[in-house]
Amino acid sequence: FKGGAFEVLHDAETNFSIFHAMGGMADGNAVIAKINPHEDISSALETLIHRAGFARANIHGIGSLIGAAFDGAPPMTSPISEVLIPPGAIWNGALHLPMECVDPDNGQYAGLLTKGRAPVCVTFEVMIVAT
């Protein structure tokens, strides 16, 4: 991955200094992006991948969510969390998005994210790499 970076800049919506994706190349093999508050993380990732035209990709990221529902696992109900996309998150024509979350009470949650049930809290930074 060449040409792109995250820079810390003031964000008027959140009133925080947060990462913003900068630079990049139109014909690159990867995308970096900041996903904004209240966007569903799954839907936002699918949109980014479709725009990039990737048939297959690995997905990496960190951020915060306002609650999260998981397929076959207990939900994370806190309106505040810190989140990691662990290894194994992929796009292969469909999104396979494992997620690990921790809430302010140190409650820990993990599983495959349910599409449409995980809005971004403050921000989410992602890197999508074509495979």
Residue ranges with predicted function:
Residues 36-79:
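Short, well-structured hydrophobic secondary-structure segments
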Residues 56-58, 98, 125-126:
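Structural motif
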Residues 69-95, 103, 107-109, 113-119, ...:
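N-terminal intrinsically disordered, cationic/polar leader segments
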Residues 29, 55, 93-95, 122:
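Residues at beta-strand starts and edge strands
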Residues 18-21, 58-63, 86-89:
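A broad, low-specificity signal for short, low-complexity segments enriched in glycine/proline
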Residues 28-36:
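Short amphipathic
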Residues 1-20, 35, 102-131:
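Mixed-charge, glycine-accented linear interaction segment located at domain edges/termini
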Residues 20-28:
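Gly-rich Lys/Arg/Thr-decorated short loops/hinges at beta-loop-alpha junctions or inter-strand turns
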